[in-house]
Amino acid sequence: MSEAAETLDGWYSLHLFYAVDWTTFRLIAEDDREAMITELETFIKDKTVARESHQGDHAIYNITGQKADLLLWFLRPEMKELNQIENEFNKLRIADYLIPTYSYVSVIELSNYLAGKSDEDPYENPHVKARLYPELPHSEYICFYPMDKRRNETYNWYMLPIEDRKTLMYNHGMIGRKYAGKIKQFITGSVGFDDYEWGVTLFSNDVLQFKKIVYEMRFDETTARYGEFGSFYIGHILNIEDFKQFFSI
């Protein structure tokens, strides 16, 4: 039996994707639309308390293309807090005009593939803590996609010896390090939580960097032989002060 990699787990994660029902929304009186937007602004402002107290974070982006219009990403210490946030959001008046298109449930994850041996408690390491319980960047662009490690008769990631997997992940990670300062990456584990095994969320002020890193990694053995991917979502940041313009008709 192949040895399982150990993981460090941080905040729980919920990506929510919505399309706006513009046809119905435009039928609402302007005063009512403005009241809905104000209610949404209040909801988001209330969630900044978690960021300020370092008990979670969130990000909101306008998705490009027809897969969705909005992405709301929330991080919290407990899964039930994500349920509470989603339930609260669904009860907003404006939610009546938002059509759910996709969601992803996971948890911020670090694996031990690249970790050295140490007696130190990794959860007390400042660098590790910053990655498990992050403050999300306010980058111009976001990219999200789910992925699996392939497991079939020809290529099965889970049957490889752990030392082979460590070597492959080391080489894979070296490509990612070339994009340090250009891309901020967050890996969330979702085995047993959602339909794929991991979610990958990338932030950058240069949207072209997403294409560059994903393309370059296609030639890495870890991806070429063992990577399987879901849909890609690209978006531009949507700040609270942008809500009125975004929802204006």
Curated annotation (Swiss-Prot):
Active site, UniProt feature: Y145
Catalysed reactions, as listed in the record: Fe-coproporphyrin III + 2 H2O2 + 2 H(+) = heme b + 2 CO2 + 4 H2O; Fe-coproporphyrin III + H2O2 + H(+) = harderoheme III + CO2 + 2 H2O; harderoheme III + H2O2 + H(+) = heme b + CO2 + 2 H2O
Cofactor binding annotation: Fe-coproporphyrin III acts both as a substrate and a redox cofactor.
GO molecular function: heme binding; metal ion binding; oxidoreductase activity, acting on the CH-CH group of donors, oxygen as acceptor; peroxidase activity
Ranges annotated as spanning the membrane: none
Binding, Fe-coproporphyrin III: R131, Y145, P146, M147, D148, K149, H172, Q185
Superkingdom per UniProt: Bacteria
Enzyme Commission number: 1.3.98.5
Reported cofactor(s): Fe-coproporphyrin III
Any Gene Ontology biological process: heme B biosynthetic process
Pathway: Porphyrin-containing compound metabolism; protoheme biosynthesis
Keywords: Heme, Heme biosynthesis, Iron, Metal-binding, Oxidoreductase
Role, per record: Involved in coproporphyrin-dependent heme b biosynthesis. Catalyzes the decarboxylation of Fe-coproporphyrin III (coproheme) to heme b (protoheme IX), the last step of the pathway. The reaction occurs in a stepwise manner with a three-propionate intermediate.
Family assignment from sequence similarity: Belongs to the ChdC family. Type 1 subfamily.
Protein name: Coproheme decarboxylase
Organism, scientific name: Staphylococcus epidermidis (strain ATCC 12228 / FDA PCI 1200)
Classification of source organism: Bacteria, Bacillati, Bacillota, Bacilli, Bacillales
Gene: chdC
